[in-house]
């Protein structure tokens, strides 16, 4: 196993699985939790994440294929997607490429939300532009855009939760891509609105504004 990333909740390994390049995601023990509680939580989250990845694929969102789930060892074996994280690509693109990519991201989020799936951790680190060998017919022959890391995802019919998803992405853009954040977010919303419908999108965006107002108020109220 080759460790490629250590995370707060899980470690990622690159591994050959039955002749295929695969990612193994292994949830790590939290020593501050009681052992029996920790086991239950890790088992549940392992199975839940695999289920949510499957549900996202059913919704038409490209995600890694899940090959195997081992709840007793808290691992998911899934497809390795050769490519680059959008975080590493976004600012090196020309304006048209960046606008197009942002529009596509909005469309993917809309597909999730139409199926009542909330990602819970929308950042440019959790989007992978696959290498050109993986073509997306819907995007004019461009590489496929994959959404990963469904560890915090859940089902919800609430507008508020959709607003939180978009707010998290907006915050991630401002944090990691300040120079192009406004432009990118605008085109994310364009793609989202086109895919989910203008009327519904405006309700979700109203929630985003509410969330931002609450955040500003909380900051002002802090002594």
Where does each model-flagged region fall?
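C-lobe/activation-segment region of protein kinase-like
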Residues: 141-223
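Conserved structural core of kinase catalytic domains
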Residues: 43-45, 57, 61-105
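Active-site beta-strand termini and strand-to-loop segments that position acidic
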Residues: 15-18, 79-80, 131
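ATP-binding glycine-rich loop module of kinase domains
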Residues: 2-47
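Conserved hydrophobic alpha-helix
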Residues: 56, 108-112
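Catalytic-loop of the protein kinase fold
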Residues: 114-124
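Hydrophobic residue at the +6 position relative to the catalytic HRD Asp in the kinase catalytic loop
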Residues: 122, 126-132
